[in-house]
């Protein structure tokens, strides 16, 4: 709808400017953590999501990296290098074979569209870096523009899930803004 976007945006087209390899700086709202810096916006989708936010901000909001143990990072690195299937959940026997303790994880496919974003950050392994996705990457996939600030804790667990709505959950439970806009346009035409 006049935004210069393709019908489909691959995962890489959506978030390749948010790689950890672009550099790090201390996370402003999360003591002891680091956030990623912007890389060059290459796709029309990245340019649309950034707007002019990156002209006034070096760090994307909520782009703080999880702290993985060396063992988990090694497992993730091995999966990226050797696991043959991208975009499908690793569970069952493959989970045991790769010594994955969590209920399952999906190694993301850079050339495909993203699977549904969930409120659980451990569900997805970044397509080229040995880490889980950041809140900002999930928000970008959901079409939240970079100027949109996400507040509260990054994650929570146990009984606190019933009373807190952390950032990953906010994004995973949200209606993607571009979808909402398009739905509004369609409804307006129907009236």
Regions found by a protein language model. Give the residues of each.
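Flexible, glycine-/basic-rich loop-and-beta segments that form/coincide
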Residues: 1-32
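C-terminal target-recognition/interaction regions appended to catalytic cores
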Residues: 33-191
